[in-house]
């Protein structure tokens, strides 16, 4: 499918870790927010993870963020502004990890807390 063809081009796949997978692409020309290029639940999430892994696209486990992105953002759309900070943390880590793999200097620390507003979490705050 066209969606699966987009996965190898993604910068990161954010997972839940098994039920949801959301592939994001950020064009670093600074003209917009990261976009959801693929997303899936259960079997489709597994396929997205497998295609990502086969193409060296980093997988990043962040359950509340994965659920929020999966539930709120359509494929091909930019992420909403109030999820930008959380996604930026993940992308910054992914880019630092790539640099680490190339240079073997200063392994980055994965972010562990994400500011996901209550209305995206799908639970009662």
PLM features: residue spans?
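Short basic, glycine-rich beta-strand/loop surfaces that mediate nucleic-acid
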Residues: 64-95
């Amino acid at each position: 499918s066209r969606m699966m063809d987009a996965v190898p081009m993604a910068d990161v796949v954010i997972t839940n870790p098994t039920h949801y997978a959301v592939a994001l692409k950020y064009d670093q020309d600074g003209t917009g927010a990261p976009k959801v290029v693929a997303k899936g639940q259960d079997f489709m999430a597994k396929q997205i993870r497998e295609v990502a892994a086969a193409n060296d696209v980093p997988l990043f486990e962040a359950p509340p963020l994965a659920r929020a992105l999966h539930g709120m953002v359509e494929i091909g759309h930019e992420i909403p502004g109030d999820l930008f900070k959380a996604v930026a943390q993940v992308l910054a880590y992914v880019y630092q990890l790539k640099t680490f793999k190339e240079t073997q200097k200063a392994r980055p620390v994965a972010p562990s807390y994400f500011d996901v507003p209550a209305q995206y979490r799908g639970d009662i705050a």
